[in-house]
Amino acid sequence: MQRDEQIFDLIQEEKDRQIHGLELIASENFVSDEVMEAAGSVLTNKYAEGYPGKRYYGGCEVVDVIEQIAIDRAKELFGAEYANVQPHSGSQANTAVYHACLNPGDTILGFDLSHGGHLTHGSPVNFSGRLYRPVFYGVDAETGRLDYDKIQEIATKEQPKLIIAGASAYSRDMDFARFRQIADSVGAILFADISHPAGLIAKGLLSDPIPHCHIVSTTTHKTLRGPRGGLILMGKDFPNPQGLTTPKGEIRMMSSLLDLAVFPGNQGGPLMHIIAAKAVAFGEALKDEFFTYAMQLQKNANAMADAFVKRGYNIISGGTDNHMMLIDLRNKNISGKEAENALVKAEITVNKNMVPFDDKSPFITSGIRVGTAAITTRGLVEKDMETIVALIDKVLTNHTNEDVIEEVAEEVNELMSERPIFAY
């Protein structure tokens, strides 16, 4: 069969872009050759509906072992009693959690998308805001941080069945123990979505949700540095609070409802090549080298936030505890969209992002979100953060000057072109 030169030329073009540029999108990272090898393996040919030992297809002896390894490694990595490695994405993991815990119309309490939450935490354009009744908490206008007393007030008033502790653009650690107190006070299930800080949490560098939250979900890329996919965890299994029973009349455990919500409730055949890649990534994350990486990632984020503050940029909440920061650009007289477009021309990729109490649309925004996961994988350290912030500042203060932008692009290429994609 003739090689598809059009597609493979574009893949090479994208590889060149990744090698020569600065990747600062907080949700992106680079995987190891071994993770890519597993994701591109013959396992993509295998259908395996069901779970290990309970498949609807023959010939699953090998993939059963692979999936069980992925499950066992995920449980070891996070100290969990239960893991489901089949969700194709974080959004589908969250969908399964909702289906297992809720009925249509039930009230959910989540982090407002415009303050740093995620689409699947109740946004009206998402299934979570259409099938359920969403109410929201946000950050304090002065501090840019969560106000747990205010969250308690909202929970007491609205009586949600599910409380979501998680974010896509919040740079501070979360107090899961306080969230659990709030959830218990109203009889709600506490569900943590740790898709962004999962790698830091797994290595003990941020608060651990597993002892406090009934259910935890995460993506397997971002700071976990695995393939794109989802994962559901529980520290301990428990009887489902809805009182649903088996055909024999026994109360179903939540693990059973979660498994059923993933398959057949939400998905058909699992992606065995991606599950194998997840297993490889979990194995990498269990090693000491990953702890070194996670610590450096956090140090880089702090150094970058400090450098931005010194140059007069407004970091929401004043800094960061994790791998990212949300920058309000209103005092710089540039929109998030303008900043993103100018930086992309300079081969620096960030994403425009709404900031709390934003007065611009989601297509324009007043801010950008910046993260250090990918550049840390490439071997950059604290001293490089000042250089990067200086380059960003140069672009943003000259965002209509094509000559300056081209000059910065050359500096970026010089900084990055000789660095490996995967340094750890």
Curated annotation (Swiss-Prot):
Pathway: One-carbon metabolism; tetrahydrofolate interconversion; Amino-acid biosynthesis; glycine biosynthesis; glycine from L-serine: step 1/1. This is Serine hydroxymethyltransferase. The keyword Methyltransferase does not apply. (6S)-5,6,7,8-tetrahydrofolate binds at residues 113, 117-119, 361-363. The record marks 221 as: Plays an important role in substrate specificity. Catalyzes the reversible interconversion of serine and glycine with tetrahydrofolate (THF) serving as the one-carbon carrier. This reaction serves as the major source of one-carbon groups required for the biosynthesis of purines, thymidylate, methionine, and other important biomolecules. Also exhibits THF-independent aldolase activity toward beta-hydroxyamino acids, producing glycine and aldehydes, via a retro-aldol mechanism. GO terms for molecular function: glycine hydroxymethyltransferase activity; pyridoxal phosphate binding. The modification N6-(pyridoxal phosphate)lysine is found at residue 222. SUPFAM superfamilies: PLP-dependent transferases.
